[in-house]
UniProtKB/Swiss-Prot annotation:
Binding site for Mg(2+): T26
Annotated protein name in UniProt: Elongation factor Tu
Keyword Flavoprotein: no
UniProt GO MF annotations: GTP binding; GTPase activity; guanosine tetraphosphate binding; translation elongation factor activity
Main localization, broad class: cytoplasm
Stretches the record annotates as G2: 60-64
Alphabetical UniProt keywords: Cytoplasm, Elongation factor, GTP-binding, Hydrolase, Magnesium, Metal-binding, Nucleotide-binding, Protein biosynthesis
Organism: Xanthomonas euvesicatoria pv. vesicatoria (strain 85-10) (Xanthomonas campestris pv. vesicatoria)
Catalysis: reaction(s): GTP + H2O = GDP + phosphate + H(+)
Family, similarity comment: Belongs to the TRAFAC class translation factor GTPase superfamily. Classic translation factor GTPase family. EF-Tu/EF-1A subfamily.
Cellular location(s): Cytoplasm
Boundaries of every tr-type G domain copy: 10-206
Any Gene Ontology CC annotation: cytosol
Amino acid sequence: MAKAKFERTKPHVNVGTIGHVDHGKTTLTAALTKIGAERFGGEFKAYDAIDAAPEEKARGITISTAHVEYESPTRHYAHVDCPGHADYVKNMITGAAQMDGAILVCSAADGPMPQTREHILLSRQVGVPHIVVFLNKADMVDDAELLELVEMEVRELLSKYDFPGDDTPIIHGSARLALDGDQSDIGVPAILKLVEALDSFIPEPTRDVDRPFLMPVEDVFSISGRGTVVTGRIERGIIKVGDEIEIVGIRDTQKTTVTGVEMFRKLLDQGQAGDNAGLLLRGTKRDDVERGQVLCKPGSIKPHTEFEAEVYVLSKDEGGRHTPFFKGYRPQFYFRTTDITGACQLPEGVEMVMPGDNVKMVVTLINPVAMDEGLRFAIREGGRTVGAGVVAKIIK
């Protein structure tokens, strides 16, 4: 059969497998690529190829992640699978592989285990919007009542962390049988049912270009006779000449109008997400804008100083701290383009945090930063990255 050419016409959705060690995440990933390749195009990736995930660096943190792709009738999926629990924690906190939805793999024989819970909690903290469940190893459970019991436990766990437990699709199956081509209900058909659930339950993500305009300020220039130009990479949305924008963060919010959009020293009518652009601002002085602020669509993002975060602290081997830190720790928090000092408040009963740990903390910054829940940041000490985090909840 001729190899199907990759068509960009299908919408692209990012997913990944989460769940306890040895519950079958990688086997399921292999089964998805195999059945996807047979039915809808794409290429089969064997278990061993996925399991030998290469190490990559994201923000100075070493993470092993396997990336595979498969198709459904209507979509193209990019799927991440991590070999170890620590890789999941790092991956989710750094946002190295952003997920529009996750496939929670839970063994029907064992039921929910500690990492099942931890991955659901992490998904909530880092803003994974949707979870679909695959109850794996269903061939090892003869008792239908036991299956129902495990399903109930998983639903309760999802609800506990504010996912819609009662409405979540839960598919029973065996990834191993499906890989072997088994045609019984829990074999290949279960994988097809899972793909259907992904298609229907995980909404298509809003493309960056369709979201409200935002550009982090990287540099500010004053051009005589023309005014102030602010440069940066447009993170989301579209900006046109004549648009009103706000300058948010660090100091009081100001309003201004964009009178010019430049790229590669050419004047354009508009810039969009992904472009490196220079924006000419009307009546704005060079000292009114600084690195660390953002330009945005008015009202679309607010400045905040206090938030709850989920943080991964780099291990010594990753170039992080060699010693733990305690409450009252005051490092710099690097948001988008700048460092802002902040104080850390640790959870009750946590006296210290060791390199290599992940922890929930409340951070109070000395200056406000434009932020939404889900924004990633680095923790630095004198320019050296010692941690990575994500804004889980804004307090004020």
